[in-house]
Amino acid sequence: MAERPGPPGGAVSATAYPDTPAEFPPHLQAGAMRRRFWGVFNCLCAGAFGALAAASAKLAFGSEVSMGLCVLGIIVMASTNSLMWTFFSRGLSFSMSSAIASVTVTFSNILSSAFLGYVLYGECQEVLWWGGVFLILCGLTLIHRKLPPTWKPLPHKQQ
């Protein structure tokens, strides 16, 4: 049985969801919402794996570490780093823009690093650091929101 060709870029066409009204903007149609969710999910996972890679590298190259723990830390660092790049590339393919994916990964990496630093090393972050995280979160909220255009198209002149 032959499969029907889809639209370019892996986008979901309106014919795939006939119950979606055509007047909905593209970012609110059924397939676009699903793609956005998976884009954000993959970017959050990429940030968490990046923080885990950094934490395992810090454990592996500590001053009082045995050779076996050092080798284990390097293996964990390499595997989590490859998982981070895999999830980041998948997040890029699902996201609406590379800026959204990059900022989402950065935010996830910062929060995951703070959590792992607290759990593994007892590190606490200062108020200024949390203020920076809040500003990044505000920026993320702004770029993930998609407002409808407020301008109306001009009527075409007939010659």
From Swiss-Prot:
UniProt keyword Ion transport present: no
SUPFAM superfamilies with a match to the protein in the record: Multidrug resistance efflux transporter EmrE
Membrane topology: Multi-pass membrane protein
GO cellular component, one term: membrane
Keyword line: Membrane, Transmembrane, Transmembrane helix
Chain ranges passing through the membrane: 37-57, 59-79, 100-120, 124-144
InterPro entries assigned: TMEM42
Localization, UniProt: Membrane
Record's keyword annotation contains Ligase: no
Superkingdom to which the source organism belongs: Eukaryota
Protein's name in the database: Transmembrane protein 42
Source species of the chain: Homo sapiens (Human)
Name of the encoding gene: TMEM42
